[in-house]
Amino acid sequence: MTRFLNYQFNLILLAVSFFTRLPVPTAIDYSPQKLHQAGRYFPLVGWLLAALLSAFYCFMLPYLGREPTVCLLIIFSLMLTGAIHEDGLADTADGFWGGQSITRKLTIMKDSQIGTYGTCALICALLSKFILLSSLAADQHLLLALAIAYPLSRGLAISHVQHLAYARKNSDNSKSDSLAQPMQPRVLLWLLASSVPAVLWLPLSSAILVIVSACVLRFALKHWFKKHIDGYTGDCLGFAQQTQELLIYLLLIITLPKTVNEQTIGFLL
C-alpha cells in the first residue's frame, strides 16, 4: 500500500510540474510513461490552482476592492500556470485560421511567434475572463466558479486524448508527446469523476445545464479539431481548456442568483 501511495504521489507531483510553475522536489521519478499516467491528475491540479487563487482573492479583496483584485487574480493565474493554456489558445487560433492545409496549420502552431489571430484570441479571452469573473464576484459566486471551472475544464480538455489521434505523426519532442495515448477506461472514469464534485454544490438545474453544455462544447471541439488537423495537439488541449473555462463562467452567471445592491435599486427607482 505504501509503495502504491508513493507511486501515485509521484504522479501528482509530475502533473503539478507539467501543468504549473509551482516548485516541486527535484527528485521526481520521471519517464514518458509516468507523465502519461500523470494526466489522470490534471483535474487535481485544477483543484490546487483554484484553492491558491481563492486564497489570493480573499486576502487581497479587503485591500483593493473587487475589480483590481480580479485583475490581479488573472495575472496570478497566468504566473501559476506559465500561461500554458493561453499559449495553446493563441497557437490554435493562429494555426486553424491562418493555414490552409493540415501541414501548414501544424507548422504555424509550432511557431513560437504569435500572429494576428492568436493575439485577438488572447485579448478576447483575457477581457472575457475579467468581465465574467467581475460579474461573478459581484454576486458572491467567484470562489464557487473557480472550484467548478478549474477542475472541470481541465478534465474535459485532457479527455480529448481518448477519442482523437495525435496530429503530429513524427515526434517533435513537444511537451504533449507523452500524453498522446488513450487512457484506460478506469483511469478515464477517475479523471471525469474528479472533475465534477464542485458542480454538486449547484442547484440541480444549474448543474445539469453546466454539465450538458460543457459536454456539448467538448464534442463540438472534438469534431472541429478533427476537421482542421485530423486529430489534436497539446495546443488544442489548451484551446479546449480555455473555452470550457469561459463557457462555465458564462453559464454560472446565467443560472446563479443575482445580488441586487442598493445602487441597482436606486437606478431602477
UniProtKB/Swiss-Prot annotation:
Q: Does the keyword Membrane apply?
A: yes
Protein's membrane topology: Multi-pass membrane protein
Compartment(s) of residence: Cell inner membrane
GO function term, MF aspect, one: cobalamin 5'-phosphate synthase activity
Principal subcellular localization: membrane
GO cellular component: a single term: plasma membrane
Give the catalytic activity.
alpha-ribazole + adenosylcob(III)inamide-GDP = adenosylcob(III)alamin + GMP + H(+); alpha-ribazole 5'-phosphate + adenosylcob(III)inamide-GDP = adenosylcob(III)alamin 5'-phosphate + GMP + H(+)
Give the top-rank taxon of the lineage listed in the UniProt record for this protein: Bacteria
- What residues form the membrane-spanning segments? 8-28, 41-61, 70-90, 114-136, 196-216
Its needed co-factors are: Mg(2+)
Return one Gene Ontology term, BP aspect: cobalamin biosynthetic process
Record keywords, A-Z = Cell inner membrane, Cell membrane, Cobalamin biosynthesis, Magnesium, Membrane, Transferase, Transmembrane, Transmembrane helix
Q: Reply yes or no: does the keyword Transferase apply.
A: yes
| Pathways involved | Cofactor biosynthesis; adenosylcobalamin biosynthesis; adenosylcobalamin from cob(II)yrinate a,c-diamide: step 7/7
Might you give the EC number(s) for this enzyme? 2.7.8.26
Q: Which family does it belong to?
A: Belongs to the CobS family.
Q: What does this protein do?
A: Joins adenosylcobinamide-GDP and alpha-ribazole to generate adenosylcobalamin (Ado-cobalamin). Also synthesizes adenosylcobalamin 5'-phosphate from adenosylcobinamide-GDP and alpha-ribazole 5'-phosphate.
- What name goes with this protein? Adenosylcobinamide-GDP ribazoletransferase
Q: What is the species of this protein?
A: Pseudoalteromonas atlantica (strain T6c / ATCC BAA-1087)
| Gene name, Swiss-Prot/TrEMBL | cobS
